[in-house]
């Protein structure tokens, strides 16, 4: 008899990947995914701890689930097994049971491969099970083969953890030290997703370009080596990777952008600030001049490359001059798309202990100014595509029956009106007819 599994995923692409793997783990035990939380036998919150008040948002969601559980009890129905997974689970640990005693399982991002055993114990009336172990190779050695196809574009996690210890960030504390997967293990998973219909693979890591796997005869495989290896797979058309750190942009990786046609001309390369003073305070391990040099070398290797980045405004000690340095960097680099946020102190990080916190209204003002600049650049990038013909990978249906959506080599979403759903999963030449801030509109030639 099948049972229903509901997973709510927060945060980054890594969590999306982990959620798919949780489905794959539990499927052999009779659990099938559902989008209806009310009919779920197991409810998993796969949480993110990056943004402000992440833990409180998790507790709020758990409160809503508690009300659902109470309703089920009144109706004489069995309660669902409740699991808190991901980075909030890693950070909060036993505190989750203290504040929400109706939660059954707390499991970290490196140990969720034990979910089948943990759930089985709860079914046998165990209580409050927790697994937050960091055993580097155990996670990937115990994950199953792909059972649920991800579609035309698939994620594969190749690197986890972070050794950089930026002073604003909790990732080193929730994901652990940097660890790279076995290159052949990655290759086998890539073969699987391609055989399942994937045309594009996005390699994931907290610092994916820190990928560094030691193979036989002490050969070290870099991310560039891994990309070259994967590019040999027949029927795999596109390769991407994220998220990268500037100090790990090696010469061979930069040059690969100019020599490997399957490596897409789009790169997300977070810089966070344009001020050398703030970069040092953030412990970013590079200055703005180093970042400019990488950008110049990338554009020499691949002139049409489109760049993306992350920015934090209002880091402690940021002056008006520091913020102007960030605006100057943005204007000099010219991005295709970006993500920008107000600094929020994360408990346990050095930035949270600083006494020179920036008032909220100043952070809001700076974010508004920065986002206006970034949106202008994003719109200009999209408008530059109008009238051109671009190869688009169609990977999903739109909200209208006759609409399908794909993405360009530059990661822009493209909408077309076409009732022929057989185009999904295919790469088609599309003439771009219209551009907006967040998408393009086109027609098939």
Curated annotation (Swiss-Prot):
Signal peptide: none annotated. Residues 148-380 form the Radical SAM core domain. [4Fe-4S] cluster 1 binds at residues 12, 48, 87. Belongs to the methylthiotransferase family. MiaB subfamily. Residues 3-124 form the MTTase N-terminal domain. It catalyses: N(6)-dimethylallyladenosine(37) in tRNA + (sulfur carrier)-SH + AH2 + 2 S-adenosyl-L-methionine = 2-methylsulfanyl-N(6)-dimethylallyladenosine(37) in tRNA + (sulfur carrier)-H + 5'-deoxyadenosine + L-methionine + A + S-adenosyl-L-homocysteine + 2 H(+). This is tRNA-2-methylthio-N(6)-dimethylallyladenosine synthase. Its main location: cytoplasm. Its cofactor is [4Fe-4S] cluster. [4Fe-4S] cluster 2 binds at residues 162, 166, 169. CDD domains: Radical_SAM. It comes from the Bacteria. Coiled coil: none annotated. GO terms for cellular component: cytosol. Its EC number is 2.8.4.3.
